[in-house]
Each structure stands twice: as structure tokens, then as C-alpha cells.
Curated annotation (Swiss-Prot):
This is Kunitz serine protease inhibitor Pr-mulgin 3. Residues 31-81 form the BPTI/Kunitz inhibitor domain. Expressed by the venom gland. One of its GO terms (cellular component) is extracellular region. Keywords: Disulfide bond, Protease inhibitor, Secreted, Serine protease inhibitor, Signal, Toxin. It is found in: Secreted.
Amino acid sequence: MSSGGLFLLLGLLTLWEVLTPVSSKDRPKFCELPADSGSCKGNFQAFYYHPVHRTCLEFIYGGCEGNDNNFKTIDECKRTCAT
């Protein structure tokens, strides 16, 4: 196989790994928790996984407490929880 073919194969395998969804059996249990802004009064953009819609959505996090279904970026949420 030529070096171009190897690079293509490596690229396709990498793309497959990135785009393959997290299966529900591999998804952490905290991904099923509801969005929880916590008890503090801050105003921070955060993201949580919504299991019914099977996507990550934005919410406002107060800055303390809450639960583990709380991500700083939508990409982090998707990598961890999205199917």
C-alpha cells in the first residue's frame, strides 16, 4: 500500500473514532441527570446532556454545587454523553 493510501486509511479510522457515538451502555450514569444550576447566583454558560432529546443543550450554571451533568463546552458534553 502506498504512503498516500496509508494516510487515507489512518484518516478514515480517526474520523470513524471521532464520529462513532457513545453507546448508551458506555454513557456515564450522570448523563441522565437533569440540568442543575446549583445554589449559587452566578451566571455561567454551561451545557448538559438531555437524554430525551439525545443532545447537549445550554443552561445557566450558578457556579457551585449542581451535578456532574455540567460541561464548560458543548464539545465536551457531546464527547462524554451524546449518542
